[in-house]
Amino acid sequence: MAVGGLQNRIKIVPHFMRLHEWIALEEGYWENEGLEVELLGEVMHHVSTHAGSRYFERPQDRPFREAVQVANSACEWGSVCNAGAGMGKFVPDLYGVARFAIFARPESGLTRLADLRDVPVGVGIMAGSHFTTLRALEAVLPRERIRIANIGGPGRRLLALRAGEVAAATLLDPEIPIADEEGFVKAASGEFRTLFWVSPEIPAHLLTGYFRGLRRADQALRAQPKKYMPLWARNIAPGLEGPYDYGRFGLGELLVFERYPEDIFEATVAFARRWGLDRDMREDSFNALSISTLAE
């Protein structure tokens, strides 16, 4: 790690859906930026394995509730709603694109979205799985026929699917390739945006260095994917360890170094409002909820 005193230290929660934080660490990209980075891997695993915690009490909420200065990531809906509820701000200077898939147990007979009428789908509330599931199901089912179950984090959801606690659950990377390998039925899949969700007290130069390191990591991953596939082992949730062929896991979440569009932000807020998921938001304007690292 680079030295440089407290002014160059930043705490980061690695995002389990991507490899970028580990690549940046291993390749020394942050050290080159003069950053001293503390990766909070235990928080990442708690996020993945929590069992249906309530909003504001989830592992990803705690650093913000406890005034710990941290850089995290979440789906676009979650990042915006969290910021609106007073938990950090989102960074509009870049975004991620991640995968989701709704899987069902093989014996359930559930093979497509239309089969999920009145079937509880396991999600983590106010997180990517929650919003993507609603968005996918509302395209084919009446609202009154859509059911969700707050099972918890993505690792916990795969464990619940294995145990038969739910017939269907929405999974993310790296659980998607594991579920594929284990023979669960993919009823639907798609992609969604993620945003960086950060403590507003973090100095802009630290976030700028963090993102520059991630840009280099994104370029390295796209250029030499095979080199970095073994790093997926670090994102496997406790309880899911296994002798996996990480070469089949794919790239995971990728980053787009373009501004998050304000019209998409408005659609994100409107979606949350339509489903009544904005109840804790005290603010809903782009400028109030975002913090840019770029000079105007």
Give names to the regions the model predicted.
Residues I148-A149, G153-N235:
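Pocket-lining segment of extracytoplasmic ligand-binding domains
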Residues A204-R279:
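Secondary-structure end/capping motifs
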Residues S48-A51, D180, V198, I291:
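Short Asp/Glu-rich motifs
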Residues A2-L141, I148, A187-S189:
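Short, glycine-/small- and polar/acidic-enriched structural segments
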Residues N72-A85, L134, R162-F184, A270-F271:
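A ligand-binding cleft/hinge motif common to bilobed small-molecule-binding domains
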Residues R273-E296:
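Conserved C-terminal helix/tail region of periplasmic/extracytoplasmic solute-binding proteins
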Residues H45, G78-S79, I176, T194, ...:
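Positions that flank functional sites
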Residues H20, E26, G78, R156-R157, ...:
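Residues within well-ordered alpha-helices
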